[in-house]
Amino acid sequence: QIALESKRFGISKWWIIFGLAINLSKDKKKPVLDILDSFSSVVQKFIKIIMYYAPIGLSCYFASLVGSFGKELVLGYAKTFLIYLIACLFIYFVIYSLYAIICGGKNGFTNYWKNIIPPSVCAMSTCSSAASMPINIESAKKMGVTEDVSSVSISLGTNFHKDGSIVGSVFKIMFLVQLFNSNTSTFKIILIALLATILVSAVPIGGGTISETLIITMLGFPLSTLPILTIIATIIDAPATVLNVTGNTISSVI
């Protein structure tokens, strides 16, 4: 394990030095950057192909898990989704409404709910914060938020402010901890959830998988448990996206 960590650290140092060397090469760095850009595009296509067939593999793995753990696993997933949905509904209806009242009083509350439905529906149907961004910015403007504030806060929030994802990370950690009867403190659960959400939020493709891998690694579980978290991510995707999108809207209002 020590040798493996040392090797990873050495590779990281090599790529940092390589990046600095490219940056210092000025005009001659363009061919290298073009090669790296092309390689990045190929890798992204490769990941897309894998993710296209991933549902088949996940279905087979889920069937295997049910065979091993029995109905308790299915009940665990159902319970996780139900509790997560209740938490999302509480934040969506109660917490965000309180923010709207604090910011604008009764008129702010009315104006908020008059315009928040379109981005919510878009988020629910697309499961994509990026796809919901244009209609989200437009809704924020109708709430009285200036275009400068709404465009900047919502654009940044799409990458770095994800209420639904953070809550989802907490539930993923709690599910694993209960499944394997592991003792983990509340502080550690919250810390890992924040790191798993914020540190990989700018990753354009495969960010969710990286987040789940980070959770597993920090908890000390084997990578074979990754599909377990992937299934949770799939079933909570829609409500999580709604919370991510509307959280950015109320942030721009604030």
Language model features by range: what are they?
Residues 170-254:
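Transmembrane alpha-helical segments and their short flanking loops
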Residues 1-111:
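Signature of multi-pass transmembrane helix bundles
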Residues 25-30, 38, 69, 105-108, ...:
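Juxtamembrane helix-boundary/capping and inter-helix hinge elements in multi-pass membrane proteins
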